[in-house]
Amino acid sequence: MALHLSPTQLHDLPAHTLVEAYRSRALSPVEVTQAVLAHIDRWEPHLHATYLLRPEHALEQARASEQRWLQGAPLGTLDGVPTTIKENIATQGDPVPLGTAAVTLAPAAADAPPAARLREAGSVLVAKTTMPDYGMLSSGLSSFHALARNPWDLRTTPGGSSAGGGAAAAAGYGPLHIGTDIGGSLRLPA
């Protein structure tokens, strides 16, 4: 199975196009988030790119964003834009497994700076993306998650510790995907 997309599908639109469409009321953050979630629902059983995918939480954020756009008061340039964020970037209240079954799952006390900036800008945090144990394996192999798969060839992995984010980006799980890189974590999936 290979992923084939039309660039006119809502889940595949770039962030700047979404913001322009929200501003003109041609699209709403809710309908875009619903389209992204439907696309993720179709592909996630094959790709294993996400951790903590919570559709209702994402839709709640999208509804709040929609109200801000209707009032002409978006929080920032990313308001309503669906985004994934790598699981090693703490989000308040969520466990941070670091890709390994060896850590105790305890909720993060606060957002890490990248997550905080995304929330301040109104971004819709759709899901966390998977990573290998401690972000240390270029293969993407994890003792906590199933191996993330390349949407263009499901027999392969994107590789790198941002393998989940790389798979999510290539599959069109929305326009923005936040990862981290020290030794190739973003560059390998790219």
PLM regions: where:
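Long amphipathic alpha-helix in the N-terminal Rossmann-like dinucleotide-binding domain
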Residues: E56-R63, G122-S123, P132
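Immediate post-signal peptide segment of exported/extracytoplasmic ligand-binding proteins
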Residues: S65-V81
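Short glycine/serine-rich loop segments
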Residues: A110-A190
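An N-terminal boundary/leader segment
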Residues: M1-L59
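Short alpha-helical functional segments enriched in proximate histidine and acidic residues
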Residues: H39, W43, Q61, S65, ...
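Enzymes and membrane/adaptor proteins characterized by extended Gly/Ser/Thr/Asp/Glu-rich
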Residues: T77-P114
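Conserved hydrophobic/aromatic pocket- or pore-lining residues that grip, position, or stack substrates
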Residues: V36, A58, G80, K86, ...
